[in-house]
UniProtKB/Swiss-Prot annotation:
The keyword Heme does not apply. This is Putative ankyrin repeat domain-containing protein 19. ANK repeats lie at residues 67-96, 100-129, 133-162, 166-195, 199-228. It comes from Homo sapiens. Transmembrane segments: none annotated. Keywords: ANK repeat, Repeat.
């Protein structure tokens, strides 16, 4: 079992690295030859040129480039508020997908373009659409430490318990991403403390796995169940022992002793 945890630790670090590549707020990789004239104008934020293109060919309003990105996707990824407003006033498709099933709202959140995201939400963008990884806009806000964006999404009825393909709610995702401020924010907004992922790992197990003693402390204060077992019958305390995280093991042990004393 110790070997399994050792492997899990290396795998966990690899996953963190790959997560940073996938979820960090980067825009689209743009090649000029993939774009139409209207796409180029939108990326530059040239609202007058975009309007000129639409006057000539109105059907270009939702035109896709060679990677299935619409004008609105590209505009949101680059934070071109004036062009976003223009496109919405012309009634472009607001919940349209790109090749990864991401909507313009997802892309605005992914790239941390808050002004664009707010405009989209105020025009009725759906915050609960999932991409090919089953992530929602809230998952991307969580990864990019966006409490302001997360709050805005929740105020527009984003599902705080949405599951991605790994079974992670935004809370579990925040713990996996080591985002303590977001963890605190989600708990204050009534996120389910007892959520489990596809391996039946609890929030506490994930916090232990990532050696996040401050998040462990926060979860213990919330009286999370320390006796829950994952798919392999391991508890959060077992995780601390196998990873040799002695200070976290001590935190859990002290909490366990308090529970046992209260039942005497």
């Amino acid at each position: 079992m110790r070997k399994l945890f050792s492997f899990g630790r290396r795998l966990g670090q690899a996953l963190l690295d790959s997560m940073d590549q996938e979820y960090a707020g980067r825009g689209y990789h743009i090649r000029d030859w993939e774009l139409r004239k209207i796409h180029r104008a939108a990326i530059k934020g040239d609202a007058a040129e975009v309007e000129h293109c639409l006057t000539r060919r109105f059907r270009d309003l939702d035109a896709r480039d060679r990677k299935d990105r619409t004008v609105l996707h590209l505009t949101c990824a680059h934070g071109r508020v004036e062009v976003v407003t223009l496109l919405l006033s012309r009634r472009c498709q607001i919940n349209i997908y790109d090749r990864l099933n991401r909507t313009p709202l997802m892309k605005a959140v992914h790239c941390q373009e808050e002004a664009c995201a707010i405009i989209l939400l105020e025009h009725g963008a759906n915050p609960n659409i999932k991409d090919i990884y089953s992530n929602t806009a809230l998952h991307y806000a969580v990864y990019n430490k966006g409490t302001s964006l997360a709050e805005k999404l929740l105020s527009h009825h984003a599902n705080i318990e949405a599951l991605n393909e790994e079974g992670n709610t935004p809370l579990l995702f925040a713990i996996n991403s080591r985002r303590q401020q977001i963890v605190e924010f989600l708990l204050k907004n009534q996120a389910n403390l007892h959520a489990i992922d596809n391996f039946r790992r609890t929030a506490l197990m994930l916090a232990v796995q990532h050696n996040s003693s401050s998040i462990v402390s926060l979860l213990l204060q919330q009286n999370i169940n320390i006796f829950s077992q994952d798919l392999f019958g391991q508890t959060a305390e077992d995780y601390a022992v196998c990873y040799n995280f002695r200070s976290i093991q001590q935190q859990i042990l002290e909490h366990k002793n308090k529970i046992l004393k209260s039942h005497l």
